[in-house]
């Protein structure tokens, strides 16, 4: 028996499976390493040393996380804490608002043109402005 993910599984489904296995949560980096170890076909299996590979991998993971959070909240199943330092499934609590209506980060990561239109020069500018 193999622990590899089925290729037809969506990245959000793969992430959900990983998060269910670790209720304490994990960092984004740990999540990426676990996806690679289970041969996810949705993220590049390349070292994260290249800035463009790092950006694209990060973007794909965060896109999947925001889609998963919306799905789980819509199904009244879980809330999802999303941060590079800790991604964690949390209990759904009726009457609370886990999904913010105007969330610029959510909007950014759900817009796939941001992935497609960001080249190496733009990644350099983003990293320079971040640090």
Report each predicted region and the residues it spans:
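Short "pre-J" leader segments immediately N-terminal to J/J-like domains in DnaJ-family
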Residues: 2-131
